[in-house]
Amino acid sequence: LVGSEMCIRDSDTVVAFRVSSSQDSVDFSSLNKLKCPDSVIRLKNIWDIYKFNGDAIISDFDLITKDKKSQTIPDGVQFLNKDLIFLEQGAKLPFCTLNATNGPIYIGKNSEIMEGSLIRGPFAVCENSVVKMGSKIYGSTTIGPHCKVGGEISNSVFFGYSNKSHDGFLGNSVIGEWCNLGADSNTSNLKNNYAEVKLWNYESESFINTGLQFCGLMMGDHTKCGINTMFNTGTVVGVFANIFGSGFPRNFVPSFSWGGNKGFTTYLTKKAFEVASLVMERRGCKFTTQDSEILKEVFEISKKYRSY
């Protein structure tokens, strides 16, 4: 785009626009309209993040590897469809299996795929992330930067700095930043009666039909769950929740909740932010005043949902 242009889709949906950096406001009626290519992925619902992840990986793979040369696949790695496997500088992958038959596999800078891991594309692991020994990962899955993952993962997206280091199944799910799933935590992604999954929707403040048969866990930033946690099909968890104990917790856990199947209390911001500061400091990051102010507002907005 050049100055005073915008890209639109479906006649009125603004995808992108470009104006002067000195403008305080934008008059869209004054901008020249350009039709957005139909190939551009549009996210209308939270589950679209994993639903269209395979398409996104394929598109991004072509873009990020253009005019670049992959590092050599090490001896001992078993692979299929070499042309759709790309290794960035510093990637380590001893004795694993990479199958790019169904889509590309991208291994980010300084990431590690430990021995015995089985990976099917489309798959992307971003820089400085680790796939633990013996992991089984199906497409279409993306592991964000600075993550540690293990166990069995299928068609899921991890944002940065989140961990699922141990055994347990995660499928058709979206995990935010700074999350941690305890050992042997499992997510159901299919109802026993094979019915379409309903998911909590903040806009309507109700459960809505996704039209999907497979839908797992939507977990907000800074949320943690203890060992052996079980999540039911179509569970939504807000930010800064701490879930533990036996049995299935409710399938909508509001932000700043503390507890599990036997009940919840409010996770107060003072303690929540102390933990976040410690967690982020371990990774060389800082929990800023701006972070605190934004999340205090989230705490207030989400109060109405914490009617335990």
PLM ranges: what are they?
Residues 1-7:
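Short, small-residue-biased leader/transition segments that mark boundaries at the very start
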Residues 133-134, 140, 146-308:
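Glycine-rich hexapeptide-repeat left-handed beta-helix
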Residues 9-13, 20, 91, 156:
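Active-site neighborhoods and metal-handling regions in enzymes and metal-associated proteins
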Residues 13-31:
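Accessory, often N-terminal, substrate/partner-engagement and coupling regions
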Residues 107, 113, 130, 140-142:
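Structured core of small recognition/catalytic domains
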Residues 29-124:
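Extended, small-residue-rich solenoid/repeat segments and analogous flexible loops
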Residues 118, 124-132, 136:
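Membrane-embedded translocation segments of transport machinery
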